[in-house]
Every structure is written in structure tokens, then in C-alpha cells.
């Protein structure tokens, strides 16, 4: 698990290789990632947008931007957390993701950015 706190928002990420959905013979590797977002501020916030930088050891870097996460614009009161799971496909056995969430403070409408810590996706080594 990797964790980072920015502007009072704690973001934790875990990953796993999805062997049943991958096809290594065709350079297709699926990884799931689980994210937990905790509001450690004394005020309510709302997640508005996400920005991902996805790196693949064969294909290089790609950018993904979008509204919210998994179709949601979660609102987190002080002390609350929000968890979700998503997936990423790579063309190789090794890659990484990092990014930024844009949040809004509901008491005054100001927006701020929160770092999503870099996390690595690697196919587990098999012992013979």
C-alpha cells in the first residue's frame, strides 16, 4: 500500500494483477487498483475531477482526465472516507500510475489539488 496526504486529504492505494482477465501472449495485462480517500479536514469536501499519468514499460506514458471517479462525485464530511476500485490495462508486465484529484471545499467553493501517490503494477514472478 502507498499513502500520501495533501491538503488534509489522505489517499491510499493498493494494486493487484488480474491474471484471469489478462492475456500475456497478446501483451495484454490487467491490474486492479483500490483507492481509499479520507477527509482529515474539519470541513466537507467534494471530489470533482481526476488526472492520471499512466506509464507502461512498452508503450510509454498516456494521460487520462475525467470527471469524478467511477461515475461518482463523492462528498466527504470531516473524518469520512470513500473507497472505490477500478482497473488499468497495460501492454507490458510493468507499469505505474500517479495523478491528481481536484477537490472543492463546500463551505466556500474554492478548489484544490490532491496528489495521488505513484503506485506500481507488476506481474508477480512465478517460481518453477
Regions found by a protein language model. Give the residues of each.
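Intrinsically disordered, low-complexity Pro/Gly/Ser/Thr-rich segments with frequent PxxP/GP/PP motifs
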Residues: 62-94
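Low-complexity, acidic Ser/Thr/Pro/Gly-rich terminal tails and inter-domain linkers that flank the onset
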Residues: 1-28
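Short, solvent-exposed loop/turn segments enriched in Ser/Thr/Gly
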Residues: 29-34, 98
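Short, surface-exposed linear segments at secondary-structure transitions and domain or protein termini
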Residues: 56-59, 72-81, 121-128
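Terminal connector regions
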Residues: 89-128
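Short acidic, flexible loop segments centered on an aromatic residue
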Residues: 44-62
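Asparagine-centered strand-capping/turn motif at beta-strand->loop junctions
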Residues: 37-41
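A generic structural micro-feature
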Residues: 25-29, 44-46, 75-80, 93-95
